[in-house]
């Protein structure tokens, strides 16, 4: 199943310049920053990097208090925040800390996710809500970087879709080192999908 996914995501990668052009016209992408999705990076500081990823505004807002606390930790040199939308990048600018750096999440190809991980070398990767990316998870696991799913949310509809993928879903969710969710239904779904370490907490 991972092979099929990689074929599909590579096809998306091939046509992605066309998609980007349309998004630029609609002002949903930054002309100066869209290349980050192809792994053109911001400057990295030497030291410990913690990484947070959220799809858009809501997900990022939900972890701002946590991120602000982490900025006070002297052991952490840089906090990388990735997202998928232009609007979320504006929210991140409101966090007043020199430790914060924002990047757009790379297209989930095997090559780009590998390149991303090798460049940033995060100590831990925090994914917010229901952000599950097969190639990124596979390569984080291969690099032995802990994956933590925070404020996890899996709906009944999403659960049914993942269950159809059976072994692929179990492998993918098995890569997650810790799932945090205050939603009992989500915890139950995650358990059935293959997640092993679960905590009924919400950040």
Can you describe what each PLM-predicted range is?
Residues 1-8, 12-22:
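Membrane-interacting alpha-helical segments
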Residues 17-203:
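Active-site and donor-binding regions of nucleotide-sugar-utilizing enzymes
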């Amino acid at each position: 199943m991972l092979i099929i996914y990689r074929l599909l995501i590579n096809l998306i990668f091939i046509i992605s310049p066309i998609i980007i052009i349309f998004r630029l016209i609609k002002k949903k992408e930054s002309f100066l920053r869209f290349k980050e999705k192809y792994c053109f990076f911001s400057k990295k500081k030497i030291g410990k990097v913690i990484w947070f990823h959220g799809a858009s505004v809501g997900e990022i807002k939900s972890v701002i208090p946590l991120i602000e606390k982490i900025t006070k930790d002297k052991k952490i040199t840089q906090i990388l925040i990735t997202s998928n939308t232009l609007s979320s990048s504006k929210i991140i600018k409101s966090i007043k800390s020199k430790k914060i750096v924002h990047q757009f999440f790379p297209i989930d190809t095997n090559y780009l996710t590998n390149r991303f991980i090798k460049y940033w070398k995060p100590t831990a990767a925090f994914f917010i809500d229901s952000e599950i990316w097969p190639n990124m998870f596979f390569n984080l696991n291969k690099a032995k970087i802990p994956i933590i799913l925070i404020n996890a949310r899996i709906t009944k509809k999403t659960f049914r879709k993942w269950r159809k993928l059976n072994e692929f879903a179990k492998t993918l969710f098995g890569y997650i080192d810790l799932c945090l969710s205050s939603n009992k239904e989500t915890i139950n779904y995650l358990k059935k999908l293959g997640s092993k370490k679960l905590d009924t907490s919400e950040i």
